[in-house]
Amino acid sequence: MSKKLFALLFVMLMLCGAALADGITVTDMHGREIALDQPATRIVALTPSDCEILCAIGCEDALVGRGKYCDYPESISALPVVQSGAETNIEEILALDPQVVLMSDMSQTEEQAKLLEQNGVQVVISDANDIAGVYT
């Protein structure tokens, strides 16, 4: 398993895993530190790869919303869909009251991440620009 994939899986598992006495601090693929007092129970994932990985590691119950291109696994089809990609809709995301938003540097902008953070949402940015960025 590559270091990038392991790091991404570790970040996601820590975001929705068992509570730790001292809270959780993880570093995303851009070197940004994300600190939570306890595991996230309300996550919006904007990219298909992030949705699939969260579900694969048993964190599907923490998902409260998904990007418009997130359609697998089928079990997430009932989740609210938010506009993602170049037209990511911050208001739609905030209406879901997430603790954490998982986004890609390919589709979302630093300005969008800052807007979410200004509204109290932790943002984890992945490097999903190509297949290698997701899986290597």
Predicted features by range, described:
Residues 7, 36, 56, 74-75, ...:
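Generic structural signal for beta-strand residues in well-ordered domains
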Residues 4-11, 16-51:
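Bacterial Sec-exported substrate-binding components of ABC uptake systems
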Residues 22-26, 32-36, 42, 99-101, ...:
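Extracytoplasmic substrate-binding proteins
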Residues 41-107, 112:
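A short, structured surface patch at a secondary-structure boundary
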Residues 4-8, 101-104, 118:
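Solvent-exposed, charged interface segments at domain starts and junctions
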